[in-house]
Amino acid sequence: MMSRIEAYQSDIAVLMDPETVLLPDFISALSYAHELGRDWLLVSSSVEIPRFPFHWDETRHFWRQDNGKRVRFRELQKMISLRSLQSNSSASKMIMAWNNIDMPLHCGVLPPFLYQRGTHNQWIINEAMSCKRRFVFDATSTISSFFLGNAENIYNRSDNVSEPKTRNWEYVGNSHLGQLYGSLYSRSYTLPKLLKCNRRYIFVSASERSTDLSIPKGKSLGFRTREKISACITRTKSRSLKLDFVQKDETVPPLKFPFDLESLLPLVADKNRTVVLSVAGYSYKDMLMSWVCRLRRLKVPNFLVCALDDETYQFSILQGLPVFFDPYAPKNISFNDCHFGSKCFQRVTKVKSRTVLKILKLGYNVLLSDVDVYWFRNPLPLLQSFGPSVLAAQSDEYNTTAPINRPRRLNSGFYFARSDSPTIAAMEKVVKHAATSGLSEQPSFYDTLCGEGGAYRLGDDRCVEPETNLTVQFLDRELFPNGAYGDLWLKEDVRAECEKKHCFVLHNNWISGRLKKLERQMMKGLWEYDASMRMCV
């Protein structure tokens, strides 16, 4: 978020939540700050209003009461001021504004915080104070802003997302990042306040015992004016920035938190009880994050990560991911040699089918996607349209003229499975077959669901498993191409070629070795993550 702001050409930058409503005094305060003659950072908390009692008139220029009477600006200010005394302002709905955006806000390295998941705003303010390059002040008493109470509980207006307060792992991750970077957990402070009294902007020191009026040089104030200003300061001192600063002796939550698969599923799943699952080890952590960043950009929040090792588990928490650890995952996973066909690959892939089966039995549909599958569009609406008793899977067939359901051409790195009796029974057979096989799970999928040698094939794009009556639908390769189909990865502009075909995804497979896979995806511009900054790009 901060990087995006710095990319703009502007005299003043403002970072705020889109649900926040600003009144005209915000512009007045900015104009005053702009004339300070030094670099500054303005911060202000917004007030929560459970129900806004006014409505727009037909011109959409004025608010009016139910009786049609126009609401004046001072009435709105009074309502906000009274409400601020009755409820806490929201740190997540804070407004931050600063000048000279070419100069950094602080001297530290910004952690990969998830915006609006706690700690971020406190960290920015603390580091700006520590850096001492800017004058940091609290303008809460001067700026009138509010948000509706229900807006605080909305993560996204899509029905496919859950409320942020349930996504506790994101707050825990931010808290730990705040401890690892900077000095937030080693100091506390209060900010000087900007007030407007007797039509004058003045700064009041943070000390409760004295008021330091910042009056321009060469000007003096009469006794009556000073009396009015003192009374104004007394009235407004209660309105100030409200942040949950961590005290020096306060301990942060443990990095391991009580979320297992069963507890994460209802928090992450969309309204159709569907989750997107990926399984990853530490060697693929950067590719995992590129995959996550892409899903976030596509506004697909209902994903889960199964960590194969403790390093991936902790890394995922710090990145704000909904992650669970598989205690039965194979140990000693090779860092560079866990590619297709290797013994390591064979052991790792069997974790995926076991996990999918467990999720299906818990009553949730699963889209299993390897992290090397690049998403151009959200495929869930299409995949869910296949209906019950259908497992939709990518085809690994590269020959453009051959049937896409040829033997051993079912790709177990991208498929959609419903939580219904035929699918669960068929997946149990796949897991049982893979457990006794010396190969990866991929041959077990085909031999079980399509029969050895393709005995259960139906036409050129389907199979029907006779005992469970499950239909396997091989996905159109124009929309779901594998890594060898149409030589797409050899095109100069892979993205343009895929978008021309209206691809949903492109699998980065049919290439051996982790480093080659990473290089190809980065060089072709299908990479969404900056590993040096641990942030999405």
Swiss-Prot record:
Keywords, in A-Z order: Cell wall biogenesis/degradation, Glycosyltransferase, Transferase
Motif (DXD motif): 370-372
GO biological process: cell wall biogenesis; cell wall organization
One Gene Ontology term, aspect cellular component: Golgi apparatus
GO molecular function terms listed in the Swiss-Prot or TrEMBL record: glycosyltransferase activity
Consequence of gene loss (knockout): Reduced growth of primary root. Delayed flowering.
EC number from the UniProt entry: 2.4.2.-
Top-level taxonomic group: Eukaryota
Metal-binding as UniProt keyword: no
Function description: Beta-arabinofuranosyltransferase that transfers specifically an arabinosyl residue from UDP-arabinofuranose to the monosaccharide galactose or beta-methyl-galactoside in vitro. Catalyzes the addition of a beta-arabinofuranose residue onto a beta-galactosyl residue of an Yariv-precipitable wall polymer in vivo.
Family: Belongs to the glycosyltransferase 77 family.
Record's comment describing the protein's domains: The conserved DXD motif is involved in enzyme activity.
Database matches in PANTHER family: BETA-ARABINOFURANOSYLTRANSFERASE RAY1
Name under which the protein is recorded: Beta-arabinofuranosyltransferase RAY1
Species: Arabidopsis thaliana
Encoding gene (name): RAY1
